[in-house]
Structures are given as structure tokens and as C-alpha cells.
């Protein structure tokens, strides 16, 4: 009898320990998961303020002072020209309603109502249309009408959570539809930088309008999981497991998408639209190897441009002529 009671006590203790562990794990998941959702993909999060705490996790060559000077001088020059262009070219505010009901806003820059060539230019993570407006200027100079939207949860667009490209690829289809409704004969190029690049790559594997003729991606990442794993190591010196797993669970519930499913790498395997891959070999945010993996995985017509000594989305400032010549040559091939 006493032995039986002892077994019951032991079993009870085991159950208490197991339940306690479950409660601790659930609590940790909620706490850690919510922290990283708030930090990384909340509209008001601090994920855009990047501070690298683990330098060893960022394996890129340093950009020398002379190169940095060239990049900054070209950036300033391009921005000044782009601001002048945006004030002179005819433009109008436009908006669409996303599949989940939020309102997305952007600006069309009209070179000529009669022309069929259009480009949609997408900005990056925690950024704005101003960061990519010089790209629109170069396309306009080549005879394109230009659409530059605010990504969801950015600027004038609604939304509480950043889509990291996965939700944004559905938003992109709404913008494509807007142009096609205006001009059924439109020829549309998609250009994305950073998260915008991930967006156009993630869209490439879906069925897009026949009006979409080419995709240009600059500094895109292989998947949401991969970029967050890289940044967890660089920013917080934290391991992928279990941090990202906790993040994934809470992001699924709050932001309504799965960071593990959100893969540009898997999407480009299904792509049929021509893609030009561009990357700087000194990118310390999205490592160059991600570009190489994406390029190798793509099963469509493709080309690649790697700019030496360029950091994240800096290729167009490091070698401006090379950058745009490659883009417009790609269309004529």
C-alpha cells in the first residue's frame, strides 16, 4: 500500500514538473515571440535601426574610405536629380485596396499617357518611396511611366505589420491590376530593392498578369526565415532555435503569415518571367551568397550583376552607369 502511494506521489510530481515546463515554454514563446514581432515586423518597431552586436556574424569585406566617398557623393547627386525630376514630371496620387481590406497608397509619375511601358518600383524594409525615387527617374528618362507605392505598414499605406515580401506580393498584384485597367496594352517591369526585391522574387513564382515582362531585384534575400536568422545572430547574438520558432508562432497569429513559408528561393524555382539579379559583394545585411543561391535556383531567363565594393542596395551608387546599362540591356536581349 505504501509503495502504491509512493508511486502516486512520484507520478504526481512528474506531472507537476511536466505541466510547469509546458507553462514555462508557453510563457517564453509568448514573451519572446511578441518581443520579436514588435521589434521586427510591427509598423512601429525598431527593426530598421540596425546595430550589429556580433561582428563575427557579418562576413563581408570592409568598404574603404575612398569607395564610401564615391558612394555618398553619387547618392547625393542622384537624390538631388530625382527630387528635381519628381517636382517637374506630372504625377498623381493613387490607391488600391489589398486583399485583406487595407488601403495602399502610391504615386504615379506620368511620362506620357500614350506610352505602354511601365515600371513599378518597390522600396525596402522600414523605408519609403523617397529611397528609390532615383530609380524611377532613370526609367522615366528611358520613356517609362512610373508607379512607386508605399509598402504595407509604411508611410501613407495602412497596415499594422510589415509583410517582408510575402504579404506584399499580393499587394503587388493589386498595383499591377491598377496599371492594366488603365492600359490593357501595358508592358510592366517590376523593380524591387531589399524587401522590395524579396517581394518581386516571391511574386515571380505566382501566376502574374501577362503584361509583366521582366523583374529586376536588387539585394533580395532567400527567405524571411533566412534573413531573420542572419539578423538574430548579427544583432542579438542569438541562435536560430528556438528564437525563430517562437517568433514564427506569434507572427502566424498576429501578422497572419508564416515566416518559414515565405521563401523567395522556392518561388523563383517556379518563375517564368525573366529576372535580373543585382547585389553588392560588400552587403552586410543581405549576404551576397543569398543572391548566388537565388540565381542558381531560378528556372527562367536570367542574368546577374555583382558590383564590387558595394554595400546593401548601394550598387546603383557605386557604379551608376553600369547598373542602369545592365538593366536596360537586359530588356533588349
Predicted segments — roles?
Residues 202-257:
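Hydrolase active-site cap/lid region
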Residues 136-158:
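Conserved alpha/beta-hydrolase
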Amino acid at each position: 500500500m505504501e509503495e502504491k502511494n509512493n508511486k502516486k506521489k512520484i507520478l504526481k510530481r512528474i506531472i507537476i514538473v511536466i505541466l510547469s515546463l509546458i507553462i514555462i515554454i508557453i510563457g517564453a514563446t509568448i514573451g519572446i515571440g511578441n518581443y520579436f514581432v514588435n521589434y521586427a515586423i510591427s509598423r512601429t518597431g525598431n527593426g530598421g535601426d540596425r546595430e550589429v552586436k556580433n561582428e563575427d556574424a557579418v562576413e563581408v569585406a570592409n568598404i574603404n574610405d575612398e569607395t564610401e566617398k564615391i558612394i555618398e557623393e553619387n547618392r547625393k547627386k542622384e537624390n538631388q536629380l530625382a527630387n528635381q525630376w519628381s517636382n517637374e514630371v506630372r504625377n498623381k496620387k493613387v490607391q488600391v485596396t489589398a486583399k485583406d481590406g487595407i488601403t495602399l497608397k502610391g504615386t504615379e509619375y506620368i511620362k506620357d499617357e500614350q506610352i505602354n511601358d511601365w515600371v513599378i518600383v518597390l522600396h525596402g524594409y522600414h523605408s519609403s518611396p523617397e529611397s528609390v525615387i532615383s530609380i524611377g527617374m532613370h526609367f522615366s528618362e528611358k520613356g517609362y511611366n512610373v508607379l512607386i507605392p508605399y509598402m504595407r505598414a509604411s508611410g501613407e499605406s495602412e497596415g499594422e505589420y510589415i509583410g517582408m515580401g510575402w504579404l506584399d506580393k499580393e499587394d503587388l498584384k493589386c498595383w499591377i491590376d491598377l496599371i492594366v485597367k488603365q492600359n490593357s496594352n501595358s508592358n510592366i517591369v517590376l523593380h524591387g530593392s531589399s524587401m522590395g526585391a524579396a517581394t518581386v522574387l516571391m511574386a515571380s513564382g505566382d501566376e502574374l498578369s501577362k503584361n509583366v515582362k521582366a523583374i529586376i531585384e536588387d539585394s533580395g534575400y532567400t527567405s524571411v526565415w533566412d534573413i531573420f536568422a542572419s539578423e538574430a545572430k548579427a544583432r542579438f547574438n542569438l541562435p536560430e532555435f528556438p528564437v525563430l520558432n517562437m517568433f514564427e508562432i506569434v507572427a502566424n497569429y498576429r501578422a497572419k503569415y508564416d515566416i518559414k513559408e515565405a521563401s523567395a528561393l522556392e518561388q523563383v524555382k517556379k518563375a517564368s518571367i525573366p529576372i535580373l539579379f543585382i547585389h553588392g559583394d560588400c552587403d552586410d545585411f543581405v549576404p551576397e551568397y543569398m543572391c548566388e543561391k537565388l540565381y542558381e535556383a531560378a528556372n527562367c531567363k536570367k542574368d546577374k550583376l555583382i558590383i564590387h565594393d558595394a554595400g546593401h542596395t548601394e550598387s546603383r551608387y557605386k557604379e551608376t552607369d553600369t547598373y542602369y546599362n545592365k538593366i536596360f540591356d537586359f530588356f533588349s536581349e
